[in-house]
A protein has these predicted regions:
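Short, conserved phosphate/pyrophosphate- and ester-handling motifs at nucleotide-, phospho-/glycolipid
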Residues: 79
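Active-site signature of alpha/beta-hydrolase-fold catalytic machinery across serine-
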Residues: 85-89
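Phosphate-coordination/substrate-recognition cap region in phosphate-metabolizing enzymes
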Residues: 1-31
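Short, active-site-adjacent cap segments at secondary-structure transitions
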Residues: 7-8, 82-84
Length: 141
């Protein structure tokens, strides 16, 4: 386990109901994380998107530069925002406003990355290996 690839910390927003009858009145501010990411301001110990990008980027850099792993297959698993941050780091998309540009990887989706000379390259992205229909989770305004 590596804490650098844990899901983003939402602070006081953790567990907040953001829809339906029990929707929290403060959920509008929290919803900016999904629809207006550059204006999302975390509260009470929450983490910013740049902080998430930095820690996942450090993990990725260390992984790619580890010579002991150069001829090995490595499995990395995490949650949606952290995985999106990892993919954005690989694609060098550091624009917070475009954080969700490619959506959220589907549940259990597989992305294959090849590392050559310390540089990661996406070979296949968001491949699904199960047959059951799963609702796509989209982020957008």
């Amino acid at each position: 386990e590596d804490k650098r690839i844990q899901e983003i910390c939402f602070g006081a927003y953790e567990g907040m109901c953001i829809g339906g009858e029990k929707m929290d009145p403060k959920s509008g501010e929290f919803n900016k994380f999904f629809v207006d990411t550059e204006n999302y301001v975390p509260i009470d110990g929450g983490e910013t998107v740049p902080q998430l990008m930095k820690r996942t980027g450090e993990f990725l850099r260390e992984l790619c530069e580890n010579k002991e792993l150069s001829q090995k297959n490595v499995l990395v698993t995490t949650h949606g925002a952290a995985m999106t941050a990892l993919l954005n780091n690989i694609k060098e998309n550091f624009d917070v406003a475009a954080f969700w540009k490619n959506g959220v990887p589907a549940n259990c989706a597989v992305t294959i990355v090849d590392v050559k000379e310390g540089k990661p390259e996406i070979i296949k992205e968001n491949v699904i290996y199960y047959k059951e229909q799963v609702r796509t989770w989209k982020v957008g305004k």
